[in-house]
A protein has these predicted regions:
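Residue-level signal for beta-strand positions within conserved beta-sheet cores that form or flank
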Residues: 9, 66-69, 130, 157
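Non-catalytic connector elements of ABC transporters
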Residues: 1-31
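Glycine-rich, charged/polar anion/phosphate-binding loops
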Residues: 16-18, 80, 147
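Short coil/turn motifs at beta-sheet boundaries
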Residues: 6, 24-26, 35, 86-88, ...
Length: 192
């Protein structure tokens, strides 16, 4: 239903079966499901080969997915590598996506896109053709083994906050309540 009606943001469907053949005295049995569009912010980065082409590839691949649409794209910025590994500079940016995927499904999708771009996970914080991180997903707070939302390190990384403030400066961090712009301003003041 949501795919057929792009202006609809949420739908709830309930199917009832009267006089269902169950061994209990019930008038009806029903199943209810709710689906909605979610807004997620993703960080993009590349420091190998044609960096901008890899970032564009990620955006194109996300738009090819029938359950995901890229709605905003930040400017791309060149940044020094993070994490102490000697390597080339990164090109970083952020995007806003509207998605019907759950956080786990979205993670699976972006991991597949990274793999299609030739990403190899050999060195922690090492060079990569394409890196895609889920930064924010609605106002969700999630702390699982392979998925942390909001992204654990996002408040410490200017290469995330700067492009994110370009497209979502007034979006609030779900844990500390500060806007992305406030987090970036704090980082700038601390560097002075």
């Amino acid at each position: 239903i949501l795919l057929s009606y792009p202006t609809m943001s949420e739908v709830e469907v309930e199917v009832e079966k009267p006089w269902a053949p169950v061994l209990m005295p019930l008038q009806t049995v029903s199943v209810k499901i709710r689906r909605k569009r979610h807004i997620a912010y993703l960080g993009l980065g590349s420091n190998m080969g044609d960096r901008e082409s890899y970032l564009d590839f990620a955006i194109d691949e996300l738009n090819k997915d029938e359950y995901t649409k890229v709605t905003k794209v930040s400017d791309f910025i060149e940044t020094e590598p993070y994490g102490g590994v000697e390597q080339d500079n990164f090109l970083n940016g952020c995007i806003e996506v509207e998605t019907l995927h759950s956080p786990d499904e979205l993670l699976h999708l972006i991991n597949a896109i990274e793999k299609d771009a030739g990403r190899e996970r050999l060195i922690h914080w090492g060079p990569r053709t394409l890196d895609i991180d889920i930064l924010l997903y609605d106002d969700l707070v999630c702390d699982e083994e392979n998925l942390h939302i909001p992204h654990i390190e996002m408040c410490k990384r200017e290469f995330v906050l700067e492009p994110l403030s370009n497209i979502a400066g007034y979006k609030r961090h779900p844990l500390n309540g500060k806007t992305i712009r406030e987090l970036l301003d704090e980082m700038d003041r601390n560097e002075e």
